[in-house]
Design a protein with these regions (language model features):
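A short, flexible beta-alpha/helix-coil linker loop
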Residues: 52, 75-76, 181-184
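PLP-dependent aspartate aminotransferase-fold enzymes
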Residues: 94-208
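Generic structural signal for well-ordered beta-strand positions
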Residues: 46-47
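A structural motif shared across PLP-dependent enzymes of the aminotransferase-like
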Residues: 29-39, 54-71, 82-94, 155
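Active-site-adjacent loop/helix segments that line or gate small-molecule/cofactor pockets in enzymes
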Residues: 1-34, 84
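Cysteine/selenocysteine-centered motifs that mediate thiol-based redox chemistry or coordinate metal-sulfur cofactors
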Residues: 2-9, 73-108
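Short clusters of small/polar residues that mark proteolytic maturation junctions
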Residues: 50-51, 139
Length: 209
């Protein structure tokens, strides 16, 4: 299949993320990836500065990761985690716990950042429900954040001013404050967290996390 044929079929049958179905942006066929570079069908190399949406922080085609994947897929590619376990998952969980502060002793595996946010929200809601305080069911977060594209994650991404404003009328309502102004070029100052502290006090009986 030529690159031109591939692009034509792509435009016919693939709906890319964050792209219009009727007027999609250009797509670039990739034939290989190594380190931080993607090789296109025409031989051009480009740097993937986004690390495949932050998923390839160690680079593409990393020999250690490739070896681990080959070894694993020779045994099994995947099994459900409900009522079943296996050594790689248990070993990874133990290594993660060893890296975290005392008291964080359990690991819940999720398949994406959005799902991780969904699960975290559900954990907070379930915690307060178990404490007989189901009214604590709102999140407190900063405006203009990005936490994912699933339903619960969109609700804490500033649905009014952010990229998910189309869904604002049907998303759960949460509490938002402006992001503190300190940054890499400005140290934290007294008062930077005043709005956050005020909002926490104002809605303390309804905030889950």
């Amino acid at each position: 299949m030529t690159p031109e044929q591939l692009i034509a079929l792509d435009q016919q049958h693939v709906w890319h993320p964050y792209a219009s179905m009727d007027n999609p942006p250009p797509t670039y066929p990739v034939v290989s990836a190594n380190g931080v570079r993607l090789t296109l069908a025409d031989g051009q190399e480009i740097i993937d500065g986004m690390a495949s949406w932050w998923c390839t922080v160690h680079g593409y085609n990393h020999p250690h990761l490739n070896e681990a994947m080959h070894l694993q897929i020779d045994n099994m590619s995947h099994v459900m985690f409900g009522g079943i376990t296996h050594e790689p998952a248990v070993t990874l969980a133990k290594r993660l716990v060893d890296l975290t502060p005392a008291g964080l002793d359990k690991v819940f595996f999720a398949d994406s950042g959005s799902v991780a946010v969904e699960v975290a929200i559900k954990m907070a809601l379930q915690y307060w429900h178990s404490k007989a305080q189901p009214n604590k069911n709102r999140m407190l977060t900063i405006r203009n954040g990005y936490h994912g594209d699933t339903f619960g994650a969109m609700a804490v991404c500033d649905p009014i001013n952010g990229m998910h404003s189309l869904f604002a009328s049907v998303l759960p309502q949460h509490h938002f404050v402006d992001a503190p102004p300190m940054g890499f070029d400005r140290p934290m100052e007294e008062g930077d967290l005043t709005e956050l502290e005020d909002k926490m006090r104002e809605h303390q009986h309804g905030i889950a996390a």
